């Protein structure tokens, strides 16, 4: 079975070798048919501490690394500045 991959935005990088990624998802409510947005935070392993808040990253599930980390960063794009 292939590993799941999620796309999200870095929210925090205050921990060593760890980033917090917010992943947004959209779905239609089954009764009211309204589009709803929900988000969830994932702790991901960032070996080189290269990602900063605002960066777009792709994370992939992995074996447990610590109590909260079950995801690793696959690739990322720097934050777009105006």
UniProtKB/Swiss-Prot annotation:
An example of a Pfam family matching this protein is Ribosomal_S17
Record GO biological process: translation
Keywords of the record, alphabetical order, are: Ribonucleoprotein, Ribosomal protein, RNA-binding, rRNA-binding
Q: Cite the SUPFAM superfamilies for this sequence.
A: Nucleic acid-binding proteins (SSF50249)
Keyword rRNA-binding attached? yes
A GO molecular function term, named singly, is: structural constituent of ribosome
**What GO CC terms are in its UniProt record?**
cytosolic small ribosomal subunit
Which Gene3D superfamilies does this one have? Nucleic acid-binding proteins
Q: Which PANTHER family match?
A: 40S RIBOSOMAL PROTEIN S11 FAMILY MEMBER, SMALL RIBOSOMAL SUBUNIT PROTEIN US17M
Subunit notes for this chain? Answer: Part of the 30S ribosomal subunit.
Functional summary from the UniProt entry = One of the primary rRNA binding proteins, it binds specifically to the 5'-end of 16S ribosomal RNA.
Q: Which family does it belong to?
A: Belongs to the universal ribosomal protein uS17 family.
The name this protein goes by in its record: Small ribosomal subunit protein uS17
Protein species of origin: Rhodopseudomonas palustris (strain ATCC BAA-98 / CGA009)
């Amino acid at each position: 079975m292939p590993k799941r991959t999620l796309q999200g935005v870095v929210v925090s990088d205050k921990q060593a070798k760890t980033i917090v990624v917010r992943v947004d998802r959209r779905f239609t409510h089954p009764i009211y048919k309204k589009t709803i947005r929900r988000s969830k935070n994932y702790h991901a392993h960032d070996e080189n501490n290269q990602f900063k808040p605002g960066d777009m990253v792709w994370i992939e599930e992995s074996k447990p690394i610590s109590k909260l980390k079950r995801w690793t960063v696959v690739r990322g794009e720097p934050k777009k500045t105006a």
